[in-house]
Each structure stands twice: as structure tokens, then as C-alpha cells.
Swiss-Prot record:
UniProt keyword list: Coiled coil, Glycoprotein, Signal
GO molecular function: single-stranded DNA binding
Single Gene Ontology BP annotation: double-strand break repair via homologous recombination
Gene (name only): II/9-2
PANTHER family according to UniProt: STRUCTURAL MAINTENANCE OF CHROMOSOMES PROTEIN 5
Protein name: Puff II/9-2 protein
Length: 286
């Protein structure tokens, strides 16, 4: 009966090693009858064999327990690592969500930048067109400036000519004064012509005074024009209107001066043609 109990324990141990499958001794099993038929020596041999197997099984069980402990420790480590990985995964998910959000914002900013770039391209094209227009206007302005400079040179030449004419008028004035002095000397002889000479002398004096007034006015306008010309070289934009106005004024003055000069010349020629200015004593016998 004891051998049967030992065998049952051994079978249970084997059952546990084989995965925990339940092994029961059936009531109809003939092992009990077989053990009863064995002799004492056979039972002892069988028991020794069972003890040896039991020792081997205990060693195997101890090894399995050690492996189980190792596996349990590894499992604990894996659990800890799993927790760490779970936390890392959670952080990665959060980082990924933040990255996706940042990516969306970046894409949105990229679209905005693209729109801004397109707008800037349009503005650049418009600026280039405006630049081309400005260049063309600058070229036209340079051409106009060159024309104005040429006009200034022409005006300077005209002013020089006018000054020369003024000098000639002064010379003529001196000649007329000399002639008037001669006429005064001839007053004693030319009593009949004295009244006419005085009238024409008075007219000539009035004309000379008007001419002097016009000359003085012309000098002032000429000085103002010179000053304006020096200023207008730096301020081209204001030059057009002022230069045109000055040109008109100068032209009118020159025309009036030329008209007055022509009138004086005609008067002088008429005076000489209508009066005999020959001095009888100076002329001598004919």
C-alpha cells in the first residue's frame, strides 16, 4: 500500500512537470493488483527505481524553479521596460501630435509665404515697370535738360549781343552829344534852324532818357536773369517756367530796344537829311 502511495506521488510530480495536466488513478487500473503480485524484492527494486526517478525529478524541479525565478526576474525587468517604453511611447505620441500640429502650422505658414511671395513678385513686376518708366522719363528729362542748356547758351549769346548793342548805343549817344555840342556852337550862325534843332534835340533827349531807362531796366533784368540762371542750374524742375517767362520778357525788351534804336537811327538819319549840318566857316570857300 505504501509503494502505491509513493508511486502516486511520483505520478503527480510527473504530471506537474508535464504542464499541470491532471492524472488520476482510475479505480479500474490494474497497477494495484500488479504491485500486489510483486515480491518484496521486486517492490524494493521498483521503489529504488522510483526514488532515483524522484531524485532526478527533484533536480529537474529545482532547475525549473531556478529558471522560473530567472524568468520571473526577466519578466519583472520586461514589465519595467514595458512601463518605460509605454511612457516613452506616450511621450512620442505627444511629441508626434505636437509635431503634426507644428507641421500644419508650418504648412499654413508656407502657404501664406507662397501667397506673400506671389504678391511680392507682382509688386516687383510693377516696380520694374515703374523703374523702366522712370528711366524713360529720366532720359527724356536729360534730353530736355540738354535742350534747355542749349537754349541757355543761346540766351547768353543773345545777352552778349544785346550788351554789344548797348555799347554801340552808348557810342551813338556820345556821337549825338558831340553833334549836339557842335550844333550849339553853330547856334550863332543857325538862328533860323535853332528852334527846329532844339525841338529835335529835346525829342532826342527824351528818347535817350527812355533808352537809358530801358537800358537800366534791361541791366537789372539781365542781372536778375543771371542770378536766376545760376539758381536754375541746380533746380531744373523750376527752370522751365521761369526761363520761359524771362525769355519772353527779354525778347520783349530786346524788341522794344531794337525798335527804339531803329527809331533813333531813323530820327538821326532824318535829322541829317533834313538839316544842313555843315559849318560855313569850317567849310571854307566853295
Amino acid at each position: 500500500m505504501k509503494q502505491f502511495i509513493v508511486l502516486t506521488v511520483v505520478l503527480l510530480a510527473i504530471q506537474e512537470l508535464q504542464g499541470g495536466s491532471v492524472v488520476t488513478v482510475d479505480d479500474k487500473c490494474t497497477c494495484k493488483d500488479t504491485l500486489n503480485t510483486l515480491t518484496k524484492g521486486q517492490l524494493i527494486d521498483r521503489l529504488v527505481l522510483c526514488n532515483q526517478r524522484n531524485d532526478n525529478l527533484e533536480k529537474i524541479i529545482d532547475g525549473l524553479k531556478k529558471e522560473n525565478n530567472i524568468l520571473r526576474k526577466e519578466n519583472d525587468g520586461l514589465r519595467a521596460e514595458n512601463c518605460q517604453l509605454s511612457e516613452a511611447l506616450k511621450r512620442e505620441k505627444e511629441a508626434r501630435q505636437k509635431a503634426e500640429k507644428a507641421l500644419k502650422e508650418c504648412q499654413k505658414n508656407t502657404e501664406n509665404l507662397k501667397e506673400t511671395i506671389e504678391q511680392l513678385k507682382k509688386e516687383l513686376a510693377e516696380a520694374q515697370k515703374a523703374l523702366e518708366k522712370c528711366k524713360k522719363e529720366l532720359a527724356d528729362c536729360k534730353k530736355e535738360n540738354a535742350k534747355l542748356l542749349n537754349k541757355i547758351e543761346e540766351l547768353n549769346c543773345t545777352i552778349t549781343q544785346l550788351q554789344e548793342k548797348l555799347e554801340r548805343c552808348r557810342g551813338r549817344e556820345r556821337d549825338l552829344q558831340c553833334q549836339l555840342d557842335e550844333c550849339k556852337k553853330k547856334l550863332n550862325i543857325c538862328n533860323n534852324e535853332l528852334i527846329a534843332c532844339r525841338k529835335q534835340q529835346e525829342e532826342l533827349r527824351c528818347k535817350i532818357e527812355r533808352l537809358n531807362t530801358e537800358i537800366e531796366k534791361l541791366r537789372k533784368q539781365n542781372a536778375a536773369c543771371e542770378k536766376d540762371l545760376n539758381t536754375l542750374r541746380c533746380e531744373t524742375s523750376e527752370f522751365l517756367a521761369i526761363a520761359t517767362q524771362r525769355q519772353s520778357q527779354l525778347t520783349s525788351i530786346i524788341q522794344r530796344a531794337e525798335g527804339e534804336s531803329s527809331a533813333i537811327k531813323a530820327s538821326y538819319i532824318g535829322f541829317r537829311n533834313s538839316h544842313d549840318l555843315t559849318c560855313a566857316p569850317c567849310a571854307g570857300p566853295a
